[in-house]
Amino acid sequence: MKVLLLEDVKNLGKAGEVCEVKDGYGNNFLIANKKAKLATNEVINKYKAEVKKKAEKEALEKAQKLQMVETLQTITLTIHKKVGANGSLFGAITKEEITERLKEQHASLDLDKKDIELKHPIKSTGIYEIEVKLGFGVVGAFKIDVVAE
């Protein structure tokens, strides 16, 4: 019996491969546990179409992320905070605050706090470069200017 593997199966093959297996193994284990489907032309063509559609969707998402990085690189986000006598901020600037201010000043950019790489909260005035990882290997950066109120 020929089956189309839906996921990697040890000692048999990887997802998307068509394998020849014994009837009992195919019916009682692979198909029963949804690790494979009976390999008919219809099933194979449907699987290939799904894979192609998924690849196109990922390519579109990656292009959108690259466009967002280009936009981010032109931005300098200004944040006004109260400052103490020694020049340090009253409270630190965190990922959450950065995303909120970014949405306020640039509504078209939809960043999540998990996309921002901030090693430690910002506790003093100055210009900082913030790294952003958007997935699909897309990395960018933008600047934050922290000024006293």
Swiss-Prot record:
Domain of life (superkingdom): Bacteria
GO cellular component, one term: ribonucleoprotein complex
Record InterPro entries: Ribosomal_bL9, Ribosomal_bL9/RNase_H1_N, Ribosomal_bL9_bac/chp, Ribosomal_bL9_C, Ribosomal_bL9_C_sf, Ribosomal_bL9_N, Ribosomal_bL9_N_sf
GO molecular function: rRNA binding; structural constituent of ribosome
This protein's UniProt keywords: Ribonucleoprotein, Ribosomal protein, RNA-binding, rRNA-binding
Leader peptide range in chain numbering: none
Pfam families: Ribosomal_L9_C, Ribosomal_L9_N
Recorded coiled-coil stretches: none
Biological processes per GO annotation: translation
Protein family membership: Belongs to the bacterial ribosomal protein bL9 family.
Function: Binds to the 23S rRNA.
PANTHER family per the UniProt record, alphabetical: 50S RIBOSOMAL PROTEIN L9 (PTHR21368)
Protein name: Large ribosomal subunit protein bL9
